[in-house]
């Protein structure tokens, strides 16, 4: 229905079925003797079938598909090679034909999930002045990410700082107390 309106739209869905202990549909036939393995297989298979279905639709030509793995599996003992270099899986399929980028900017980047916001918008054809939104950098640009520019240690230290203004004016504009966790125990509530 959204396609038929002729207006741009976004559809987002999350597959949480691969969170521990694995939540495969009771309707599927188990392929493995392990619930978690079945959940991973089922999730990947359903995602594949959904993408193949989209490719057959009239709106595919104008559709950017983004698959983001927001973290590694929390069931680390499931994987046999514990020393392997496991990484998140991220895919941008069918980006806008207007997207211009150098292949060099896609390799060996130091980036974070913050960068996915402007990167996804750019993949959809949105022009971003300065190639940055919030803390994120469009990874299709040659602009350095905040982690490339300042390093992990510095950025993480800055992000860990507390902001009295933010806590009192944004999180608690009506003065209600907010539970806080602070490593130096100087402040328990905003």
PLM segments and residue spans:
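Solvent-exposed soluble domains appended to multi-pass membrane proteins
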Residues: 1-190
């Amino acid at each position: 229905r959204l396609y038929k309106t002729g207006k741009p739209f976004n559809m987002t869905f999350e597959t949480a079925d691969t969170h521990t202990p694995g939540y495969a549909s009771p309707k599927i036939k188990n392929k493995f003797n392990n619930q978690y393995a079945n959940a991973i297989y089922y999730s990947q298979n359903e995602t594949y079938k959904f993408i193949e279905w989209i490719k057959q639709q009239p709106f595919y030509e104008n559709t950017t598909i983004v698959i983001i793995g927001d973290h590694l599996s929390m069931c680390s003992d499931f994987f046999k090679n514990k020393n392997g270099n496991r990484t998140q899986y991220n895919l941008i399929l069918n980006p806008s034909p207007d997207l211009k980028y150098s292949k060099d900017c896609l390799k060996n980047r130091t980036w974070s999930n913050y960068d996915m916001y402007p990167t996804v918008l750019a993949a959809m054809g949105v022009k971003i002045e300065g190639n940055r939104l919030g803390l994120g950098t469009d990874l299709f640009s040659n602009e350095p990410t905040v982690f490339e520019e300042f390093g992990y240690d510095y950025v993480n230290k800055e992000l860990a700082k507390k902001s009295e203004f933010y806590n009192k004016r944004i999180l608690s504009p009506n003065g209600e107390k907010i539970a806080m966790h602070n490593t130096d125990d100087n402040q328990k509530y905003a």
